[in-house]
Every structure is written in structure tokens, then in C-alpha cells.
């Protein structure tokens, strides 16, 4: 990841990045879902993105470290905590991105800051991510909403690879913009990182009710799984689309 937004690289957003994070032991769990049902759950201004006509929902449990805002002191106690994201795939005026239904995190101040300054649907949750051999045991239960719970054990099972452009793996993982709405206005935030170094993965889900808590039904079929050991990420300011 570049620290210099001035670098002559078309993939780097314009302007100055404002925050950096490291994502560790990331599981991508992807389920195909009915596009007509999902369309009604995203803001009308956004277009639901599909791959060969198929819509997808993804869950990403990971450990967030090295959270730091540029030009500001470190957030107390926010150097490392688990996070769990529920997302789908959208476009706006041809620009692909991500739309989050929820982001659970085990840090009250980070949740408050993300809700206030980035208008994202963060929730405070009791969470734990522990190493277990070459895998991760992951547990999450949202505070005040016992129905939004998650428990899984996952691990990589292949050599690392980078996804081929135009493949489903690439379409699901190489996304560099998020969209959100606030008071009927559309906002977006750009991020930048190196291409994902993925591994195929296996996972056992003993509890998985986060999607259900948002009235999203996941299919009974096994999800498509990817694992990534580490990713350094830069964030640009949230901007209102005008």
C-alpha cells in the first residue's frame, strides 16, 4: 500500500488518505442469493451488482489492527479488535463498490466514531478471535440483539494466489469503494490496498444468524470461501455524491 496519494497510479484515489488499518486472518464467506429479494434491501439510488446475473452476500470476520487516523493521536485501546462485516455488491453510475448491511466490532469508541463520522451501520458486539493451529476460532454476539450472533472455525487450505481479472473471485474481493446513505443523501468512501493474496479455505459455522437479523435468508448450500492472511488498507475521506 502506498503512503503517498500523489503517486502516479490510476488505482490510487485522488487527494490525501486519512486513516490506515491492517486486516488480519480474513475469512470471505460468499453466498449466492436471490437478486429480486436483495434489491429491495439496498437504497434505491444504488444498482445491485451481479455476476452473470447472480447476486451475492458476503460475511467477513477478521482481526483489525494498526488502526490510526492520519494527523491524529492513536485511539485509546483501538490498536486491535475483531470486526465482522455483512455486505453485498452494488454500483453507482458504473462504479462498483460495496454496500454494508452491518459491521460488528468489539470496540465501543470505534463503533461510535464510525457511525458518527462515516454514517456506517456499525454495532457494538462481544467478540473474540483466537488462533487455533493454522486456523481461527471466531465468536461474535451483538450487544442488545441476541439474534445477531456468529461462531465459526476457519483455516486456509491452499497455497496463496491472486484472483484472475473477470473471475468470480476477483469480482467478490477486489472492491475499492463503499457506499452508504445518510438523510437521503448518497456518500462514498474510497480505499486502497494491494491486490488480495487469497487462499482457498474451509470453515465450520456453528452459529450464523447475523444475516437473518437483517431479514436476509442465506441458502442452505455451502458458501464459497476465501482466506487472506493480512492486508494493509488506506482510507480516503467520506464524500457526498453531488
Region spans (language model):
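Short, surface-exposed linear patches
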Residues: 49-53, 71, 81, 110-112, ...
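Hydrophobic, proline/glycine-rich low-complexity stretches
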Residues: 1-70, 212, 216-217, 224-242
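Short, surface-exposed, charge-dense and proline/glycine-enriched linear segments
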Residues: 2-7, 75-87, 129-135
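Internal, well-folded beta-alpha domain core
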Residues: 26, 85-242
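A glycine-rich, hydrophobic loop/mini-helix early in the fold
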Residues: 51-57, 64-104
Amino acid at each position: 500500500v502506498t503512503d503517498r496519494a500523489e503517486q502516479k497510479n490510476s488505482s490510487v484515489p485522488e487527494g490525501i488518505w486519512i486513516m490506515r488499518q491492517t486486516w488480519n486472518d480474513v475469512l470471505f464467506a460468499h453466498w449466492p442469493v436471490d437478486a429480486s429479494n436483495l434489491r429491495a434491501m439496498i437504497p434505491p439510488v444504488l444498482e445491485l451488482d451481479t455476476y452473470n446475473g447472480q447476486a451475492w452476500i458476503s460475511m467477513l470476520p477478521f482481526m483489525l489492527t494498526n488502526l490510526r487516523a492520519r494527523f491524529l493521536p492513536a485511539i485509546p485501546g483501538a490498536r486491535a479488535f475483531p470486526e465482522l462485516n455483512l455486505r453485498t455488491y452494488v454500483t453507482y453510475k458504473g462504479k462498483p463498490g460495496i454496500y454494508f448491511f452491518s459491521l460488528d466490532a468489539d470496540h465501543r469508541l470505534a463503533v461510535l466514531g464510525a457511525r458518527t463520522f462515516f454514517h456506517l451501520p456499525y454495532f457494538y458486539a462481544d467478540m473474540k478471535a483466537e488462533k487455533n493451529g493454522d486456523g481461527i476460532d471466531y465468536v461474535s454476539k451483538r450487544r442488545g440483539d441476541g439474534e445477531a450472533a456468529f461462531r465459526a472455525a476457519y483455516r486456509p487450505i491452499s497455497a496463496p494466489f491472486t484472483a484472475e481479472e473477470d473471475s468470480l473471485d476477483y469480482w467478490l474481493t477486489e472492491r475499492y469503494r463503499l457506499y452508504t446513505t445518510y438523510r437521503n443523501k448518497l456518500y462514498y468512501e474510497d480505499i486502497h490496498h494491494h491486490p488480495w493474496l487469497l487462499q482457498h479455505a474451509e470453515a465450520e459455522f456453528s452459529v450464523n444468524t447475523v444475516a437473518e437479523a437483517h431479514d436476509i435468508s442465506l441458502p442452505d448450500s455451502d458458501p464459497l470461501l476465501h482466506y487472506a492472511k493480512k492486508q494493509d488498507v488506506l482510507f480516503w475521506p467520506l464524500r457526498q455524491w453531488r
